[in-house]
Amino acid sequence: MNLERLRKRVRQYLDQQQYQSALFWADKVASLSREEPQDIYWLAQCLYLTAQYHRAAHALRSRKLDKLYEACRYLAARCHYAAKEHQQALDVLDMEEPINKRLFEKYLKDESGFKDPSSDWEMSQSSIKSSICLLRGKIYDALDNRTLATYSYKEALKLDVYCFEAFDLLTSHHMLTAQEEKELLESLPLSKLCNEEQELLRFLFENKLKKYNKPSETVIPESVDGLQENLDVVVSLAERHYYNCDFKMCYKLTSVVMEKDPFHASCLPVHIGTLVELNKANELFYLSHKLVDLYPSNPVSWFAVGCYYLMVGHKNEHARRYLSKATTLEKTYGPAWIAYGHSFAVESEHDQAMAAYFTAAQLMKGCHLPMLYIGLEYGLTNNSKLAERFFSQALSIAPEDPFVMHEVGVVAFQNGEWKTAEKWFLDALEKIKAIGNEVTVDKWEPLLNNLGHVCRKLKKYAEALDYHRQALVLIPQNASTYSAIGYIHSLMGNFENAVDYFHTALGLRRDDTFSVTMLGHCIEMYIGDSEAYIGADIKDKLKCYDFDVHTMKTLKNIISPPWDFREFEVEKQTAEETGLTPLETSRKTPDSRPSLEETFEIEMNESDMMLETSMSDHST
């Protein structure tokens, strides 16, 4: 009987994915060869591929092969891992090797002529050891031990520099900081293990690591020319555009990838985040339904559905349901945790939002977004010290991100550091202009309004008006922008213009107490500036307000109480990795006001029309 021919047939059926046929012949070969270890190993492989995990593990462990051969130990542990028996899998990998293992192997070679499995089973020892480290990392991940998981992935990569799965798990899950990524790349023995492909590996690794770098034309080494159109390389470039807030260019690149490969795994999270940032709800709806139909067990499918419900608004309960399903399928899926936090943040549920963001921060140590959102929530709960600390951490990871710069400026404003706030806002504006030469995305409207607020504090009234008018171009029907312009006009003594702007603001939002109060004061001051006799021309200008002169004179006494409280508007904008729709919340803050006579002699001692904070979710 020619067993070698039957063994080749087993491998042939495995290559053709005819696993049942392969299993049948592997079982017969194992019996004919008197259960030689390599035949039992291939029998276990066939059982594993037919999802008979416990049978496969029993075939190896009942014969003690997992204690004698690294390949058998790895396969037995992988069977337990596939059956979600994580602790048993770890026990198999970490079991102590018998002292007489090498003597026994030598005996097998001498007595039975059995060859070294490294050559007979077509696997090198370094490759098997790397696979064991990789599997150990996955098990630690499943057991929520991220530190040991990270260490195991690093070891797997050092043992086998071609083990891209370990590298991808480290980078795509943001398990390393930028400095740690750099140190890892330098520590890899590329010249020792892959002399010929060293340039190729270095290019591919560096290209995937530079997500926070400024996007530039991809420079392909001559030795690997032809990778310009490779989809993984294009996705890495798109990711850099995404993290530098150039969402339109990112969308162009991801659309090209999705056209060539509609379900490209590494492109999907970036593409979904871009659709949210650009508010393409219909496209996201179509994509999410297609993903759920085709890949119901993939967390990115439910992440897409959750993002859609967050984007359309008033569907936060639905969004949480689907995002929770994504985190159940893969509890280390960071983008879903960020979006889950957004679903609470939109309802001003700060504690639940921060809990989700903290979970994301633990999972995504190398990503700045969880830190940004935690800081934002602390800012909204008036804890500026903690907010500043988290913004600083986000800034250390992504120093070029205009969203982070903007939030640091907001904290400086709240601390009364007007010059510092202006610097951060202007830096953020420069970064945005560098992306597209001019500010056109409506998500930057809060930044322009905040520049107007800080310029008003610095008594740069002309510049403040200019910034508020630019904000009106982006979002024309924003009542708070009109009231801010009216306020500046009142400070400049242009009471007629101020009255017009406050009236427009009230037309857009009738319950704006700040505009109601300021309108009354400006009308009174406008009358005071006019002649004692109110002529027909003045009456014509004021008749639209339905106030008689007596009402105007007594307006201060009627509406002064609202000075005690004023409504602040906070605009948050979400997305990650990950982008979700603009969120608006309001809160009231006590404030003491000077007398009417002092109102326009000095800039009001208000805590000011609250700076709008922008929030963007990068989903990857």
Swiss-Prot record:
The modification Phosphoserine is found at residues 112, 490, 560, 595. Its main location: cytoplasm. The modification Phosphothreonine is found at residues 581, 599. Keywords: Cell cycle, Cell division, Cytoplasm, Cytoskeleton, Mitosis, Phosphoprotein, Repeat, TPR repeat, Ubl conjugation pathway. Phosphorylated. Phosphorylation on Ser-560 occurs specifically during mitosis. The keyword Calcium does not apply. Pathway: Protein modification; protein ubiquitination. Residues 585-596 have a biased composition (Basic and acidic residues). GO terms for biological process: anaphase-promoting complex-dependent catabolic process; cell division; positive regulation of mitotic metaphase/anaphase transition; protein branched polyubiquitination; protein K11-linked ubiquitination; protein K48-linked ubiquitination; protein ubiquitination; regulation of meiotic cell cycle. Residues 574-599 are annotated as: Disordered. InterPro entries: TPR-like_helical_dom_sf (IPR011990), TPR_rpt (IPR019734). PROSITE patterns: TPR, TPR_REGION. GO terms for cellular component: anaphase-promoting complex; centrosome; cytoplasm; cytosol; mitotic spindle; nucleoplasm. TPR repeats lie at residues 4-33, 37-62, 70-93, 128-159, 164-187, 198-222, 232-260, 267-294, 299-329, 334-362, 369-397, 402-434, 442-474, 479-508. It is found in: Cytoplasm, Cytoskeleton, Microtubule organizing center, Centrosome; Cytoplasm, Cytoskeleton, Spindle. TPR repeats 1-7 mediate homodimerization, while the C-terminal TPR repeats bind to CDC26, burying its hydrophobic N-terminus. Component of the anaphase promoting complex/cyclosome (APC/C), a cell cycle-regulated E3 ubiquitin ligase that controls progression through mitosis and the G1 phase of the cell cycle. The APC/C complex acts by mediating ubiquitination and subsequent degradation of target proteins: it mainly mediates the formation of 'Lys-11'-linked polyubiquitin chains and, to a lower extent, the formation of 'Lys-48'- and 'Lys-63'-linked polyubiquitin chains. The APC/C complex catalyzes assembly of branched 'Lys-11'-/'Lys-48'-linked branched ubiquitin chains on target proteins. V-shaped homodimer. The mammalian APC/C is composed at least of 14 distinct subunits ANAPC1, ANAPC2, CDC27/APC3, ANAPC4, ANAPC5, CDC16/APC6, ANAPC7, CDC23/APC8, ANAPC10, ANAPC11, CDC26/APC12, ANAPC13, ANAPC15 and ANAPC16 that assemble into a complex of at least 19 chains with a combined molecular mass of around 1.2 MDa; APC/C interacts with FZR1 and FBXO5. Interacts with PPP5C and CDC20. Interacts with CDC26. Interacts with FBXO43. Belongs to the APC6/CDC16 family. This is Cell division cycle protein 16 homolog.
